[in-house]
Amino acid sequence: NRVSTNSIVVGYANDTKTGAQGNGHVAYGFGNTATEDTTTALGGGNKATGPAATAIGSFNEATARASVAMGNVAKATGEKSISIGNYSVAKSNDDIAIGNQAKTTSTGDSIAMGRQATAGNANALAFGAESNASGWGSIATGREAAASANFATAIGYQSKANGSASVAIGKQNKSNMADTITMGNGNTANTMGGIAIGLNNKADSSIGDSTTANKSNLQIAFGRDNEATSLDTIAIGREVKSTKTGAVAMGSRINANGDYAVAIGNSSAGGTVEAGDYAVAVGFKAKATGGRSI
């Protein structure tokens, strides 16, 4: 053992001695190094080399001021960083990494908790097994959740928030463009500002069950098996389609397939309510297929 002033050393092959004599070192176990003021290394093969650093367990490294590394081969390399677990890494100042192979990889103030959780940007938060928050200020919570853009939020199993300031909440949702929102199970929002809420929606702006809205912004599909597929379209109900600019369809088994068409009503299986360009169709199995007809 090598012992410096006002230090405590117990065990074998420990080192608390520095060139510029420090004080208050504690090394207990085998092959530990505690070489800055008020450092603590307990266990085997630990290194506490930053001022006031603490390394506890097996082969952990706390190399920056007031850093803490605990577990097995954990590393805390940023000032006031905390790394706890097996091969966990807290890279930058004020980072926290807790869990098996959890890691922070960017410039500071990030948190990764859970097996193989990764916080890959400043101010990012990753919670859950294999979660990944790689955007600045992003949040990923849940198993395999991923927030890959700045300010993105993904919460739930395999949910992905890939657009800036996008939100994905639930199971296997995908918000792929800026400012999109998906909530529920298996929803996708593919264009900027889109909303998909419910089950298996593919949406620009949709709420419901198995609805589709795409191509442009300002679309709404609400209900089940609906499609709003052009600019400023609205589809509400079941098996409703609004496919041209400004079209509105409400009810069951309805097609508003003309520009600025309005179709409202219901139809039995095998039938439809239809409206053409600038046309209005209202009622059971109503059809206004001529331009500007009612």
Model region roles, listed by residue range:
Residues 1-294:
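Glycine- and small/polar-enriched repetitive beta-structure motifs of secreted/surface proteins
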